[in-house]
Amino acid sequence: MSPLVRRIFWILNKFFMVPMFRLGFGPFLGSPFGGYILVLKTIGRKSGVVRYAPLNYAIYKGNVYCISGGRKTSDWYKNLHANPEVEMILPGGTLYARMEEVSDPDERLLITRQVLKNAGFAGFFEGYNPWHISDEDLQLKIADLPVLRFHPLGVGNGPSDMGGWAWFWMLAITVILIVLLAR
């Protein structure tokens, strides 16, 4: 991915995707074209500050899986290794989970293909079509790609819970309705 495209995704993720998920609009953002996205809440390995990372994902056998397109250089990936227990804001709810890397080659192949298919147009940014590439070619392409399994441990804080932002739009709509009805 070119530096320009990477920067565009960074801006889109930071100023649109993360706020929309924190406001509770995650269920309205997923589509086959745009991809299915979750927001990972990590703890900064140096700062200790909560960081948010929108990621494409797949659910398989009760676990949530993600891949690190930036390989091992992504900050969120490094943060996970410092603190592998995270909260994940999925469109249907929030989970508290523990991360582990997938090492089994068959599982890596199956999961990577599904995550890339679930990524919509972004799934093609690896330089191939995840729907049509052969298993052998895909295994070669993903040799250095971290595949991460998140095993759910419990429920996390969602947009409507403490620390979420859903209260903001609910309050705004309430105020607007009161103003309109008072006229």
Where are these regions (language model features)?
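Juxtamembrane boundary at the C-terminal end of a transmembrane helix
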Residues: 177-183
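Short beta-strand segments
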Residues: 35-70
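N-terminal first-folded block
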Residues: 20-46, 168-176
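Short conserved beta-strand and strand-loop elements enriched in small hydrophobics
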Residues: 40-41, 84-94
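Extreme N-terminal tail/first-helix region
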Residues: 1-30
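A short mixed-secondary-structure module that forms the rim of ligand-binding clefts
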Residues: 62-87
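A short, compositionally biased
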Residues: 33-36, 80-84, 144
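Charged, gly/pro-rich active-site loop segments
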Residues: 1-10, 93-177
